[in-house]
């Protein structure tokens, strides 16, 4: 497994290689008995159908505004549990110390962090960052916009393939509180145990609003891999609506309410109680076709 963009890694496959969470920002905090700085980066966060700003606000903001806030979050320090360098036995203590509903985006004397935190993330043992040729992708995107040629989902897919920017992520949106913290703990454990490879969650915004958990896969064109990640997420106890977004949209700053009227999410997954064995129904949104 390998590959991806500002993302995480091959979810559900248990192999090495993987997306590059937000293209590995410049600073992060990793748990190795105590916090320490470590270079790395991931990706912005998302709303019910696309991405919200990491600040937590969802409505009335342009795609440009959301992209700017996402970039700011990527550049701030992250809280990271890295299973490649930290014993799995320390995970529970880390989760208890940094529940996402209490970690604040800009720091607060009463929260676990006194300084800004862009994201909280978990890296699996097989995680190897690989974001592809993001600079080449962005240059090709600029050229496409000035060429006057149509900009369609197919165009973006081909750009992503050409520049090997193939990662994507399942998005889980929850209000701050017990359900969010419980869901994040389940996802983080799945990462550390090797059932998923990389995930991150946004900190709590001053304005409130939902927070987002992003669970990454290596290749958005690999439908089987995307569905395997959905199954692993459901097995971790997640029952809410999931949506899936390729990182090419994030790298190019394409969020909801964008000027091209593109929908950045490819799939949605709905939990099915007592339904099929995999526990969810996944819809291909572009073609309105059920995949499971």
Swiss-Prot record:
Pfam families: Bles03 (PF08939). Residues 1-60 are annotated as: Disordered. Residues 11-20 have a biased composition (Gly residues). Gene3D superfamilies: RNA Cap, Translation Initiation Factor Eif4e. InterPro entries: Bles03, TIF_eIF4e-like. It comes from Rattus norvegicus. SUPFAM superfamilies: eIF4e-like (SSF55418). Belongs to the UPF0696 family. The lineage of its organism: Eukaryota, Metazoa, Chordata, Craniata, Vertebrata. This is UPF0696 protein C11orf68 homolog. Residues 1-10 have a biased composition (Low complexity). The gene is Bles03. Residues 35-44 have a biased composition (Basic and acidic residues).
């Amino acid at each position: 497994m390998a590959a991806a963009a500002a993302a995480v890694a091959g979810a559900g496959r248990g192999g090495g290689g993987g997306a590059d969470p937000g293209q590995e920002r410049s600073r992060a905090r990793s748990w190795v008995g105590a916090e320490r700085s470590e270079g790395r980066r991931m990706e912005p966060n998302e709303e019910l159908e696309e991405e919200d700003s990491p600040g937590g606000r969802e409505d009335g903001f342009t795609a440009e505004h959301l992209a700017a806030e996402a970039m700011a979050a990527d550049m701030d320090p992250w809280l990271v549990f890295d299973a490649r360098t930290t014993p799995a036995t320390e995970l529970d203590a880390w989760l208890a110390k940094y529940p996402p509903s209490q970690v604040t985006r800009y720091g607060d004397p009463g929260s676990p962090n006194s300084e800004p935190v862009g994201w909280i993330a978990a890296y699996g043992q097989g995680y190897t960052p690989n974001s592809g040729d993001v600079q080449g992708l962005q240059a090709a995107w600029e050229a496409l916009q000035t060429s006057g040629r149509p900009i369609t989902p197919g165009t973006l897919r081909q750009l992503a393939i050409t520049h090997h920017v193939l990662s994507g992520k399942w998005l889980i949106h929850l209000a701050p509180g017990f359900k969010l913290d419980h869901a994040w703990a389940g996802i983080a454990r799945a990462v550390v145990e090797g059932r998923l490879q990389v995930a991150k969650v946004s900190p709590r915004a001053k304005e409130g609003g939902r927070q987002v958990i992003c669970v990454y896969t290596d290749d958005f064109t690999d439908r089987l891999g995307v569905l395997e990640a959905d199954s692993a997420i459901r097995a971790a106890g997640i029952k809410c609506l999931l949506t899936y977004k390729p990182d090419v949209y994030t790298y190019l700053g394409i969020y909801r309410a964008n000027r091209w009227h593109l929908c950045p999410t490819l799939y949605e997954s709905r939990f099915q109680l007592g339904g099929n064995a995999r526990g969810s129904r996944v819809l291909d949104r572009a073609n309105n076709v059920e995949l499971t």
